[in-house]
Amino acid sequence: DYTSLLRKFCDDFERTGKIDYEGMRPYPSMLFGLETALFSVQASASGRNPHHLFENAFYEGRRPILTNGLVWMGNYDEMSKRIDEKLDNGFRCIKLKIGSIDFDSELSLLKKIRNRYGPSILEIRVDANGAFGYDEALVKLNRLSSFHLHSIEQPIPTGQWEKMGDLCKKSPVPIALDEELIGINNISIKSSLLDTIHPHYLVLKPSLHGGM
């Protein structure tokens, strides 16, 4: 089980002083956790704050990392309120989840939102979580393009590399891979995936993709 396997990897590290990258590659959350702990120990040993894993402007508090604020799909009033809250909190980029309600209704909401918040005020990204079928995806992407979107995450379900690659070539909205990357831990398979799909962006999650 997970706990026993994690214990084994920690015991191996304690015995050898080295991380078993090949053995841990199929378990990205464990690898991320162990690497983070190691960086923390190394920072402490060098006299730095153990929470400051690297020496750079971000950890020194001189430069932020820009992120997007997540806004779930709802009615227009709810979404406007959430967007206003994000803007008040300093966000200038939001990500909207789409694909959970009628597509025309989502387009209507996006139109109202974009009319209120122009591209110079708010950057909008959308995440379909694989909700589109391949045969309908390009039509939907063309309709979404009128809202000056930064990108769309995972328009179709995972495991369709050739079809996703075709969409990346033709889509007027840049495509980001998210779920497509999860579980792809072998380096040669990762390379093959990227060479086949040629995505515009990657959504990297250390605890899901393995390590720092």
Task: Label the model's feature ranges.
Residues R62-E78, D127-G133:
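Active-site mouth loops of central-metabolism enzymes
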Residues E22-Y27, K95-L109:
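Glycine-rich, proline-tolerant flexible connector loops at the mouths of alpha/beta enzymes
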Residues D1-S46:
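Metal- or metallocofactor-binding catalytic centers and their adjacent structured scaffolds
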Residues I101-M212:
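Catalytic core of soluble alpha/beta enzymes
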Residues T36-W72:
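Glycine-rich, aromatic-flanked loop segments that form ligand/cofactor-binding clefts
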Residues D77-K81, S108-K111:
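Active-site glycine-rich loop that binds ribose-phosphate moieties when present
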Residues E85-K97:
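Catalytic domains of carbohydrate-active enzymes, especially glycoside hydrolases
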Residues L38, G69-V71, I98-S100, A128, ...:
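Short, structured patches in soluble enzyme cores that scaffold and shape functional sites
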